[in-house]
């Protein structure tokens, strides 16, 4: 039986819909935590799940029997939140966890100790009880990811081009940021890319809650020293477009209803006109005396 303890950080990601945390290796398998900061089927709760990473590429028939605990760390005290220990079988179609891990309002509560400086800390502890199928993932290899340094930020290759363009257009964006920890800096930059991606959607695809979340996230990044006036302006533009779109849709529905009523009135009037034409035509017809002469 092999026991492993992994600590994961969600950095300002509490505003996003889904966050997949960095995988860690236990007994030859890569495991990962997936967090749903807005809840998954349980709105208003942090949802947290554990699964074997890249399970679709693993050999046919593999399974892992594991006992695990997921802990939400209170960073201001020793009173962390830890649900009961769970024992389950994992395979390529199953992930286990807690859909209602912890209420979001308590996480966001002032001085709660869970969300500190935009950072939520989660600890996963896993005991492997039984192994079916050989996976053999190297711990040294699996935990290393290729990264690229862009203007002092350690990024994934897929992020580097976008971030380079951001610095070209806004060279002062990170000139006064406070965090020095590379993981925190990477987390902030990932959040920025997510915000840009969100605002790139059409106004119809975004809810008012989405725009409110973006506003809060921008505020968090500005508090960390990022210069994001340009992104705030984009947010206001998108919000205005959404407002104009909704107002236009409302006017259009009202006009369509009026047009429908007018068409109905016209249809009734046309029927009356035809009826009146028939009466006029009958009145103009010559009288017949066949019945009397």
Swiss-Prot record:
Keywords: Coiled coil
Keyword Chaperone (UniProt): no
Sections of the chain in a coiled coil: 227-285
Domain of life: Eukaryota
Keyword Ribosomal protein recorded: no
Any Pfam family: MATH_2
All residue ranges annotated as the MATH domain in the record: 3-126
Gene3D superfamilies: Apoptosis, Tumor Necrosis Factor Receptor Associated Protein 2, Chain A
SMART domains: MATH
Record protein name field: MATH domain and coiled-coil domain-containing protein At3g58400
Originating species: Arabidopsis thaliana
């Amino acid at each position: 039986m092999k026991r492993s303890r992994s600590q994961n950080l969600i950095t300002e990601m509490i505003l996003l819909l889904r966050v997949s945390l960095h995988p860690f290796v236990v007994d030859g398998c890569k495991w990962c935590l997936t967090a749903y900061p807005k809840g998954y089927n349980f709105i208003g709760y942090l949802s947290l799940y554990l699964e074997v990473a890249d399970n679709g590429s693993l050999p046919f028939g593999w399974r892992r029997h594991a006992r695990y605990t997921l802990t939400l760390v209170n960073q201001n005290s020793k009173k962390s939140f830890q649900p009961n220990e769970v024992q389950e079988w994992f395979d390529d179609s199953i992930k286990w966890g807690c859909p209602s891990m912890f209420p979001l309002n308590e996480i966001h509560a002032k001085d709660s100790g869970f969300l500190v400086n935009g950072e939520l800390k989660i600890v996963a502890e896993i005991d492997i009880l039984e192994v079916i199928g050989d996976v053999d993932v190297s711990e040294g290899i699996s935990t290393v990811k290729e990264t690229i340094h862009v203007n002092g930020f350690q990024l994934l290759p897929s992020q580097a081009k976008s971030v380079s363009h951001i610095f070209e257009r806004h060279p002062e964006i990170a000139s006064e940021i406070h965090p020095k920890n590379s993981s925190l800096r990477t987390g902030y930059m990932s959040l920025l890319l997510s915000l840009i991606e969100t605002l790139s959607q059409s106004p119809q695809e975004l809810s008012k809650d989405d725009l409110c979340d973006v506003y809060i996230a921008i505020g968090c990044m500005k508090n960390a020293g990022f210069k994001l006036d340009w992104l705030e302006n984009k947010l206001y533009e998108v919000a205005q477009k959404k407002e104009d779109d909704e107002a236009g849709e409302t006017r259009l529905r009202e006009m369509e209803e009026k047009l429908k009523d007018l068409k109905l009135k016209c249809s009734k009037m046309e029927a009356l006109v035809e009826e009146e034409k028939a009466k006029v035509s009958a009145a103009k017809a010559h009288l017949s005396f066949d019945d009397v002469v």
